[in-house]
């Protein structure tokens, strides 16, 4: 082999390696931001969102519904998602989050090859579709909540046992359904993420960013972690996340510093205080209820306005939870309180 032939052979061999090298260079892991990005700036600018806890739990009166009741139990008689979003708009909220699937396993959309969803119930309305449509009508950013804990699909209620592969594949499939149907979703909250491995959390983070590259992904820290750290740090089992979520916990008195250190690196992570407006939840007295149940009363307008103002002063978003009843509407007493809260907020601003 002469020098020219040798050079050609070496070039050909090198060309076989180039695609792999190029792929490795172009597939750097997407990770939480170290500085304010467009998405995070928009999130902070919105300041105020609402979440809606509405699912099978509403019809059993149990925040910890395990999905042991038939799909026919879910039967809203006067479902009006537009009323939810209109009320949120009137309150001053700028984004809204729906419990697409809570721990009961019941899905609020017709999920493919899945028999525990609205399509299997007496009221087959695709609540997710109606929610996204109403958000567009009233000009709120839309987002979804999805619970990893799921006794219906896991076979038992266990806060800590890692998810098995068959259920994890369902999680991926359902999140892909939601985000491929509604690309560029502004916000996704995953709850009870400590049941996932670190690799699984990264895979879901990257999956959602594929469809919503400028969206916000929140891995909830949950109640006890939030009360312990007040959003000053990010827990390992809530990583990766774009925002620190403080469940049923107000921001620290000194205010939130978004420059959060995690494993020796500083990230830019806003805080979101996620506050339920229901009465105390009896199985866990320090926490308030998320879902409507008989006898449910909403926080006073003064308390809601105070929570809003405290979050503003402490450099945190407020995600205020609202609870539609079994009719599928926000109760009149809740709407009245929320309208009064809006008047107080506007008067003080």
Residue ranges of predicted features:
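Twin-arginine (Tat) signal peptide motif
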Residues: 1-7
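Mature catalytic domains of secreted/periplasmic carbohydrate-active enzymes
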Residues: 7-17, 25-349
